[in-house]
Each structure stands twice: as structure tokens, then as C-alpha cells.
Amino acid sequence: MHPAFSVIFLTTLIGAGQGLFLALFTVESYAAFGLLPTQSDAFYAIGSAIAFLLLVLGLVASFFHLGRPERAWRSATQWRTSWLSREVIVLPAFMGTVFLYGMTHWLGFNPVFAQLPSGAPINLTAVLGSLAWVFAFALYICTGMIYACLRFLREWYTPLTVINYILLGGASGFSLGAALAAVLAPDVMPLLAGWALIITFLGLVGRSATLVRNARLKPKSTLQ
């Protein structure tokens, strides 16, 4: 398969942006439960800005493979049956929550609404981060299912397509998170680097499984 470069840029940039946000929220979640030192708001704000920039660049790349970009908004109207329509809806929702998450950290406005029995605070960034976490995985699923639901492309018509989107996007994002932590939050760099290695290995396993599966596919028809 040889997809257009715009599709490659779209999926790579947006997937990395999703993964970077997940890395940031992983650190904040660990810190909330006392498993890591509390990090500066600048770490989360700058990381969110980078994730948001990747999402914007991916969105820009998506317009290059649209025949009529000015009609792109209409694709959201088929959300009941189309994974592309669902992606068009979930992507801006995810971008919006990532933006608010980053701005909340940047402004230092983070009121606490309640506490869990463990003592972990339920604050504004925890709420926004949880919403963005849901949107991030929903977006991975929507993007993967755009290709995994195509029966005539047997190489993609498999749950492995969705799994690989999640793993490879997560590997890219956690690697970026580890690089950012090396500069702004050295205390959490080993955690993010470790997760990046684990997810990358799982991505290798998933991709290898896909290649093995595709190699065993038999054509349904021949020229003979």
C-alpha cells in the first residue's frame, strides 16, 4: 500500500500529538497519587503547546488530500455511519481540551473540586485531562477504523490496524515526552523513557503480527 504523503503526515503528526498529551497526563496522574514529584506548570503548558501544534499541523496536512477543502465541514454530518465523520467531530474536541489543559497550567488556575479517598485531588486539570484522555483514545480508534473497516483492503481490514495506530502514536508521543522531560523535568524522564521503550516494543510486535498476517493472505481471484 502506498498512501499519499498528506495522509502519512496527518496520521503521524496527530498520532504523536495524542501520544505526547497522554505522556503529560500520565506524569500528572502519577504525581497526583504521590508516585512522582510534582512538576512545574511550565512542563505541562509547554508540552501541551507542542502537542497542540502537532495536532494543528496534522489538521493542515489533512486538507491536502481533500478534493474540496471548503466543504470539509460537511463530512461531520454522517457521524452515525462514517468513521471519518466521527474523527472530524472528535479531533476538534480533543484539540480544545488539550488547549484548555495547557492554558490552565500556564495561568496557574487549578481549583480543587474534591478529593479521592486516597487523598489525590480532583482539580480542574484532572477533569480536563481525563476528558482529553477519553478523546485521545476515541480519536485513535476513529482514525484506525477509517482504514480497518475497508473490506476491499484486506491488508487493513483487521483490528491490528487500530491497535497499531494506538501503539505507534503512543510510542512517538512518549518519546517526545521523554525528550521534553530531559530538559524541563529530569525527575520524570526515566519513567517516560521506560514507557516509550515498552510501547515501542509492543508496536514492533503489533506491526510484525500485521506483516505476518498479510503475508498469509491469499488472493480471492487471479488472472488465470
Which residues make up each language-model segment?
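Hydrophobic, membrane-facing alpha-helical anchors
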Residues: 1, 5, 46-52, 68-74, ...
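N-terminal signal-anchor module of multipass membrane proteins
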Residues: 1-54
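Long, contiguous internal "core" modules enriched in hydrophobic/ aromatic residues
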Residues: 10-16, 32, 79-83, 89-224
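Hydrophobic/aromatic pocket-lining and membrane-interface residues
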Residues: 22, 65, 176
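Membrane helical hairpin/interfacial module
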Residues: 26, 36-97
